[in-house]
Amino acid sequence: GQISMDSVGVEDTAEQLNRLIDIGETMARKYDVVVTNPPYAGMGNLSAKVNEFAKENYPTSKSDLSTIFMERTLSMCKNDCYMSMINIPVWMFLTTYEKLRKSILLNDTYVNMLHLGRGIFGSDFGTTAFVIQKGHIQNYKGSYRRLFDKQGAVDSVETKEQWFFSEKGLYVAKQDELAKIPGAPLAYWASKNFIAAFEGDNLGRLCDLSEGIHSRNNDEFLRLWYEACANRSSLSTFSKAKKWYPCNKGGGYRKWYGNNDYVIDWENDGQHIRNFKKASVGNNRHRFDEGITFTTITSAERTFRYSPEGYLYDMAGPTFFVHNKELMYYILAAFSSKLGYHFLSAINPGVSLKLGEVNNFPIIVENQELGQVDFLSKENVTMCKDDWDAFETSWDFKVHPLVSMSKGLWDATSTAAAMDYFYGYLPEASCPLEICYLLWQGQCKERFEKLKANEEELNRIFIDIYGLQDELTPEVEDKDVTVRKADLQRDIKSLLSYAVGCMFGRYSLDVEGLAYAGGEWDSSKYQSYIPDADNVIPITDEEYLNDDIVSRLCAWLKVVYGADTLEANLDYIAKALGNKGSTSREIIRNYFLNDFFKDHCQTYSVTGSGKRPIYWLFDSGKQNGFKALVYLHRYTPDTIGNLRIDYLHKMQRVYESEINRMQDMMDHSGNAREVAAASKRKDKLAKQLKECREYDEKISHLALSRIELDLDDGVKVNYRKLQTAQDGKFYEVLADSKNIMVKEKK
């Protein structure tokens, strides 16, 4: 029959409705088994509508689509039936998913789990596959497989398959016991004694743990300590009348003491940062108190360090403050022992550790062991501080160890006794510098072995206290010992860096620590070795000048180790460096020309900071026409002008003279090989001269601008400022500008 206008589309609509009804019935139906590979997406990547839906309907699992699917698929199971899934493992430990874990532990049953770690899908986020039974079975023991050795390690599928069939990482865990661990992490490997430890005191009852400052603009408020003017910094001696204060900010793997890299602007009780709307300054109660600090975000093993009085701390380096000071070193030792990693890897093995999770750490105080633990812990802090302070990146650095060792060389008897103590015999040495290195090497080895022995003894004590003899052993691997062994090339390079510091007056052979890092210059500090007068040290590819960096190094070595052993010391340095060259001076010259500034930038940086050099390299380009170092803290508006007139123009005259000499040799020599060599060198010199003239044109704009720098602005800002003329144009005259200076504001 005919179709009226009223019935048009009714059949299509009915078909769509029937489809929706089918879907609804399917979703409402209960199943014996539900299996899925869920979508992985955090709520931050999804729309506001999806977020709102998740909060309303899945408040327990709302943080990720994959965990929402866990909750939803369980609801689709009949009682006593099964849900199985492959998922990423973040839900097993993070506090964000604590409610979901508790819900499953209390209401359902983990039948089995394959905790695969990373590698199943390449360099992934990790994988876990599991079966959960709907409904709780009391005292049920689930079967778990842990198919990775180290958190974060990426292993091949073949390796995991081999481990699986060899029954590696097989655990049987009673689910009701797992629920007793605070935060309900799925720590299926936890033993009875491990779980029992949580029944006593925890860190939260013995300490105040504070998150600290959240500046929300690190470039504005934070500096690496050596960027700032020393007179405006409260470093070794606490003072409330300064601008820059030490700030714990986490850092890499280091136990007991160290990672003291940053200072924060806290002038006038933090007025600047308090006035920044986005910032929060945390709790006032323990500001500047001594405590224990750690790194919140790290993929490596988490480490804990003593924090002296006078420090602030931010979110990346929270600090806890022990109520009873007599327990501080005991608690530090517990966290720094194998116990620390063992418990924290159960509480949260992820890269980010929350403060509440640290508060759950169980602390068992054994009074009979308190004195011994306290003694060993303090000794470890002292040794690690000595190690940290032996390098110039510590603000408590006094003198380079290879220089301090030289002061005792006059006493041959005591030197021989020290050698016999460290080595059991008197090793041969080619020069005074080698003797100093051997003494330093012995000292480092002794410290390393003593710290390792102390840590193993602390491990033994805490393993016994917590009853974990079946799970942990006290032995410590060399790679996990914080203090550094001697390293010839590293230590010779650091000696050259210290020598350059003496050339600029940052250090003095007559006073310990920083001799000058801003403020008023005091010439009385420099008697044995006089620093460069105008703060410019040229680096040349040949011996053109009598005041270049190699000449100055030779003068410095004579003062430190004696003039009669200069050549032997130069040979020792050159051999350690391993650079190209036919003579010791040439090898050292090539190091300064090609590698010193790279090493300096690497030394004066920490993870995430970018390069923050304090000795700046004026560099004309690839031809090495002109290179000179300038010390940031001695810079004045006249520095560039002096550098241009007294050094750059001087090098141009040198090149012109040498070009004429090569031409004269070509014109008058009858030796073909000599003529060819002169021609080749003339071409090189011509390129260097051309580069210098082009560089002179750029640097003249900056010299005329007489640029002022403010140390408070930091290296990144000042590196750009120094290369920006009065007319606002940028002239690149410093090395590696792209990777050092702050990005241009658009």
Predicted regions and their residues:
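Signature of N6-adenine DNA methyltransferases within the class I
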Residues: E25-L235, N259, I273-N275, D289, ...
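Short coil/turn segments at secondary-structure boundaries
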Residues: V8-T13, R205-E220, S236-T237, N259-V263, ...
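C-terminal, active-site-flanking charged/polar segments
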Residues: A129-H136, E326-M328, K338-Y341, S352-L353, ...
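Terminal accessory regions of large proteins
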Residues: T393-W395, P401, S406-I435, G442-G467, ...
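Polyanion-binding catalytic cores of nucleic-acid enzymes and NTP/SAM-utilizing transferases
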Residues: V111, K168-H323, D374-K378, T393, ...
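Conserved S-adenosyl-L-methionine
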Residues: G1-Q2, A14-Q16, T36, M85-K102, ...
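Short Ser/Thr-interspersed hydrophobic loop/turn segments at strand-loop and sheet-helix junctions
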Residues: N248, R285-T303, Y313, I331-S345, ...
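Class I S-adenosyl-L-methionine-dependent methyltransferase module
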Residues: G1-R29, V33
